[in-house]
Amino acid sequence: MTRKSNYNYLDEDNIEDESPIGLGTSPIEFNLDKENKNKKRNSVKFNLDTPLPIINNKSSQDNNNKNNNNNNNNNNNNNNNNNNNNNNNNNNKNNKNKINNSLNSITPYLVDYKDDFDFKRSVYDFDDVDYLEEDSFDEHSFYKTSYSTRRCIYRILTYIRPQIWYFVFAFLALSITTLCQLALPYCFANGIQEAIRVNLTVNSVNSTDNNIIITPTPTPNITTTTTNPTVLESITSKYTSLFGNTEYDFKWIIIIVLVQTPFLFARYLLFTMAGFSVVTKLKRDLFKSLLTQEVSYFDSNRTGDLKAVIASDSSILQNCITVSLSTLVRCSLQLIGGLLILVFLSWKVTLLMISFLVILLISFLVFKKWIHPKYNYIQEKLVNIGLIIDDSIGNIKEIRLLNAESKELRSFETELEILHRSSRSFVLMNAFWISFGSLLVMGTIIGIYGFAMSQTLSNSILLLQFILYSLMITASMNGLIGSINEIQKLISSSKRIFSLIDRKPIVHFQGGITPSTDSNISFDNVYFNNNNNNSNNNNNNNNNNKNNNGMILSNVSFIVNKGQWLSLVGPSQSKEFIFSLIQGLYYPTRGTVFIGRIDTKVLDLYFFRSRLFTISPLQTVIFDGTVEQNIRYGLSHLSTQNIIDASKKANLHDFVIGLPHGYDSMIGKNNFFDPIQILKISIARAFLRNPSVLLLDETTLPFDSKEIEDSIELLVQNKTVIAIANKLSTLKRSNNILVFDDNRIIERGTHSELSQKSTSFYVTSVLNSINNKYNNNNNNNNNNNNNNNNNNNNNNNNNNNNNNNNNNNNINNNNKIEIYLFLI
C-alpha cells in the first residue's frame, strides 16, 4: 500500500500551528523489527519536532490534471497491442519495487493498517503484537475456518481455568457416584443369587419327602421387651420377606444409594455453575470483539451468522460443559471400571466383549466421518432459514407494500425443501447407525451369554454379574458415542467462536495519538474502494490501468481548517464516504486522512469521535428506552437538567413534556415517532456533546421546518462544519466548495468563484438542481396556500350563506310571530 505524497514543505509563515498535536515535542519511536514468518519489518523513527506537511491547493490541482492525463494515457494504452500491455505491467512492477525500496523513509503515517499497535505514551513497540494469520478466519463464512482442533481445545481450557476448583470438586463427586454405580451390580447379583439359592433349597426339601409336613416350632410363651425397628431394618425386613435372607447385601445397597445421592446433587450443581460462568465470560468476550470490529466487517458478513455465533454456538458450548463433559467422564470411568471387574471375573469373556466393543468403535468412527459433512450442511441451511425469517419479520412493511409475500414464501419454501431433502438422508444415516449399533450391542450380550454358558458359569453368581456389567459397559459405550458427538459439535462451534474473538480489527478501536481540539482535517490523494477494504491492497498499483473500476473515491485531496465550513456537492455517492473516512469507520485504500498532523491509522479514534458528531436523518437511530435515555445515549454521567437544556436548544422540550410520561416516556423502533421529532433528538444529542467538528447531511433535512433550521443554526456556531449541501444559503456561507462527479473532485472554490463560470458543472448541474428543488417546493407551497385560500373563501361563502339563511329564518320567524299576534 503506497502512494506518492502531494505535500509541500512550506515556510513557517504558511503553517498555522507548528506545535505537535497532543504530544508536545517528545519524539515518538516505532519499532518495526518484528519478523512475522517471511515478512521482515523495517525500523522507522520520526520526531514531531520536524516540520510537517500541509496541502497546497495549487499542487493538488496540478496533481488532478496529471491524474486526468494519466487516465487518458491509460485509455489509449488499452487500445494498444499485447506488447504494450506487457510493458505497462513491467513498469508497474518497477514502480512498485521503487516504492517498496523507499518505505524506510516514509513517515509512520503510512504504516500498513493491518498491523496492530501497542500504544504507549511515547514509544510504540510492535514486537508484542500477536499477529493473526490471514487464513485463520474466513470473512464470508463461519462454516469454513482453518482453526485447528488442538487450538480450540486449548482456548476452551483457558476459559475453564478460572473455574478450575469447581471442576475439581465436580469430578471428585462424579468419581464417587461412578464407584457407587459400579458397586451396585455386584450387590444386586449377590442378593438375587442368594434369594434363588434359598428358594431352590426349600423346593428341593419339599420335593424329596412329600410325606413329611414341616411345621414351624411353636414359640414359647415368654414375655419380651419390644423395641421400635429402625428405618433401615424395616426396609430390610420387607425386602427379606419378599426375596429371602439377603439382609446383608440389601443393607449395602441402601448405604450405596444414600451415599450416592448427595454427590449426584453436588456433581450437577458444580458442573452447571461452572458451565454458566465459562459461557458468561465467553459471551462477554465474543460480544466485545464483535463491537470492536470495523464497519466493513459487518458489510461482508450476514447478521444472522453473527447472531448464530453468539446464541447457538455458545449454547452448544454451555451444554457440552454442563452435560456432555460430565457424561464423557462418567461413561469413561464406568467403561474402564466395568472392564477391570470383568477381567477379574473372567478374562476370557472380557476379551470377547472387548472385540465387540472395538468393532462398535470402528463403526462409529466411520459413521462420524460419513455423516459430519451432512450435519454441517444442515446447520448452514438452518442459518439461511433463520435469515429469511429475520428479514421477513423485520421488513414486513416493505414486503406488504411491494406485494412481495409470495416471493418471500417461495424463498422460504425453497430453503425448507433443500433442508428436507438433506434431512432425509441425514435421518436415514442415523436410523442405520442406531439399528446397526443396537445389533452390535445385542450381539455382544448374546455372545457373552453363550460363551459364559460354555464356560460353566451358568450355575454360579458370575453369570449374573457378567450380564449386569455387560449391560453397564454397553450403556457406557452409547453414552460415550453421544458425548463424543456433542463434543464434535463443540469443536465446530468453538472454531467459529474463537475465530471471531481472536480476529484483529482492520480499523483499530481504541488507543493511539490524541489529536488537538483545534485540529484541521485533510485528505491527501485518497482512493477508496469499499469492496477491497477488508483485504491487503498489495495489488492496487496494478489496478491503475483499469480506470479505477469500483473506486468510490479517486485522488481526493483537500484541507479544512478549524472553524471553516466545507460543502460537498455533486451527484456522486463519494460525499457520504468522505464522512465515513473522517469518522474512522473505514481506512482509505490508498492515500492518507489526517486529523491535524496525525494519520487516522494511528489516531485515537475513540477520543476523536467524542469531539465529532453527524446529523443525518438517515443515520439517526432510536433505541428502545425512554426519551431521556435516547438523548443521553453514551453519556450516563450527565444530569437530567443537561438533557432538558439540550432539548430546549433543539426545540424538542415542548413536545417531550406533552407526552404522557414526559422524558420517561418509552420510545423505540416500534414507536411511531414523527421523523421531525426523531431528527430533533439527534440535534439534542449534538448539543449535549458540544462537538468541535460537525458533519451535516442536508440532502435529507426537511426544508419547511423553521425549528430545525433555527436549532442547526445555533449548533454550527464556532464549529468546523463539513456539509453535504443541498441549500443555496449553505453554499453561500461556505469557505470552500468541492464539486464531485465520477468519484473525484472536478471543481473547487467558493460560491462566488464557481458561479462566475457559466459553463461549469457547478452552475449547469448543481445550482440548477437546487433551484429546481426550491421551485418545486415553492410551487407546492403556493399551491397549498392557494388551496388553503380557496378553502377559506369557500368557508367564508358558506358562512355568508349560513348568515343569510339565518337572517331569512329570523325574518320568517318574525313574520310568524306577527301573524300569530294578529290572530290573537
Curated annotation (Swiss-Prot):
Gene Ontology molecular function terms on file: ABC-type transporter activity; ATP binding; ATP hydrolysis activity; ATPase-coupled transmembrane transporter activity
Residues annotated as domain ABC transmembrane type-1: 167-489
One Pfam assignment: ABC_tran
Low complexity bias (residue ranges): 63-101
Region (Disordered): 41-101, 772-813
Cellular component terms per the entry's GO annotation: membrane
UniProt name for this protein: ABC transporter B family member 7
Name of the encoding gene: abcB7
